[in-house]
Each structure stands twice: as C-alpha cells, then as structure tokens.
Amino acid sequence: AIKPIQALALIETGAANGFHLASAQIALACASHNGAITHVELVANWLARLGLSADDLVCGPSLPWTTEAQEALFKAGGAASRLHDNCSGKHAGFLTIAKHLGHPVQGYNRMDHPVQQRVIGILEQMTGMDLHDAPKGMDGCGIPVIGVPLGNLALAMARLGDPHDQPEERQKACARIRRAMAAEPYLIAGKGRFCTRVIEALGEAALVKTGAEGVYCATLTGLGLGIAIKIDDGAQRAAEAVMIRLLDRLGALTESAKGRLLNLLEPPIFSRSNEVVGVIRCTHPELALPG
C-alpha cells in the first residue's frame, strides 16, 4: 500500500530521469499488478534497459493474478516467473535506483542496503515518525517492511496528495507520482481491479492503493486527505467495502463516478449458478448505505 511513497526515491534520486522512465514505469513502481502480458512485457523491457533480467529480481516466481491470465500463460506454454509477481515493478524501481547511484545490485532488498535506507528515510519524513525502533520484518516479496500506525500512514498519503510542507523536490516528486498513477490506472492493478476502476473513474482526485492483509490506502488530492485502512482478519473485500464508502462519505465520489462504480458500493455475491444471492455491505453506522 505504501509503494507510491517508496517510489518517491525513484524520482528524487534522479534515477527516473537518468533512465528516461515514462509514466508507465513510474506507475508500475507503485503497482500491485495482475501479472498480465502488458505488465510482464513492460517490466521485462525496463529491466533490459538496466542491463538486467528477471533473475535479478528477489521476488519469487508467481502466477498471474487472474484465472484468465493464468490460462493464457499455460496455453502459450509459459510458467510462473518473477516478472508475474505483483511487486515486480517496485523491485525494478529499486534496481533502477541502485544502478543510477552506483550501488551494488545484489542485496538491494536488504534493510542495510543504501537503496532501502534511502526509502526508509523518505518514509520517516512522510509519516512524521522516527522508525529506528519501529517493528521491522520482510514482506511477501522480500522487501523490508516497517510497522507504522494507521494515523501516520494516513498522514503520509495526505502528504502525497498535498505535500505543501515538504521540500520543493519532494513536492515535484509527489506530483509526478500522482500524474503517473492517474495516467496509467491499468498498470496500477489490472482489468476489473478495485484500484484500477476507482482511478479510472476519479483520476488524480482519488488515488487508491491496495496492500496485503487487509490494508488499503488512498490520497484525496483535492481535499488534502489521506486514508489508511486495516481490516483485522486481513480480508481484502472488507477493505474495499470500507474504502468505497469512505470515498463516498468524504464527498470524493462524483455522480458520474458513482454510476461507473455502482457495483463496488455494494458488490453482489453470486451463487455457482450465477444468481445474485447477497451483497457485501459496510454496516458501520457512519458508512452504511441508507435503506
């Protein structure tokens, strides 16, 4: 969920300009993508530009996110690869920073690697926290993860959308991240995904980003607000139900967007006969739909 914050290092170090990255690569650095053909080819070409390959990624081999993409892969005689991992764009971003600054590529995912230390420094500034004693570990794709309270995470997302209290270079970097995410919603996630659909409908006004274990974040650029959600049992569908209702409650959903996102406000539950047998509904009194 914090990939857009981590990707600030790609801009601020000059690595993005040094390797002539476009909005597509910036968006992929922020993405939890489906591993569809478009995602895989773009990341592969990006790595080739660095003189690297999928073998240089520390994220493990994965299958594409969707059944449709998995079937297409198998029919083509393909197999799971590191390029299909939903975090491969983030890893390509870290490798780009390492190459640009002349740091070793090997071990780019280690907590003590200069790339990760730079990323942690940015995270400290954006969250307003000293993270030295914060809980630390490794996430599923092999990158350091740090425990941050939801309030500080929401502050970081608010600053991504409105970085007026940050240095000028940070403000420019935040703007570039926002533009890339808004310009390439498909690359952020993929066909039918919540993140992609919301960004397609609202653009830079509401940039949402999924995370693991029921974490979801958003920046509401025009409102200067950040959102950070954590569902206790890690359920993503619950996080999405809360996020869409928060966007509506905070006035971020235009009438046009509501029309496009109607089946996200109360997602239908289908039987195996494809009949609607229920809906996913947020029941919190301040977020529940009327009726």
Task: Please provide the spans of the model-predicted regions.
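Inter-helical turn/loop segments and adjacent helix faces that build the functional surface
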Residues: N17, G102-R110, D133, L160-Q171
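Active-site SXXK
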Residues: A1-A16
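Conserved active-site and cofactor/substrate-binding residues in soluble primary-metabolism enzymes
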Residues: I5, T38, N86, K90, ...
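Beta-strand segments within the central parallel beta-sheet cores of soluble alpha/beta enzyme folds
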Residues: H20-C30, L57-G60, P135-D139, E169-A183
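Structured C-terminal helix/loop/strand segments within mature extracytoplasmic catalytic/sensor domains
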Residues: A158-G291
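Active-site-adjacent helix/loop patches that line small-molecule binding or acyl-intermediate pockets
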Residues: L21-D133
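Internal, well-folded beta-alpha domain core
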Residues: A134-L155, R159-E169
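Residue-level preference for non-acidic, small/hydrophobic
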Residues: K3-A7, L153, G224
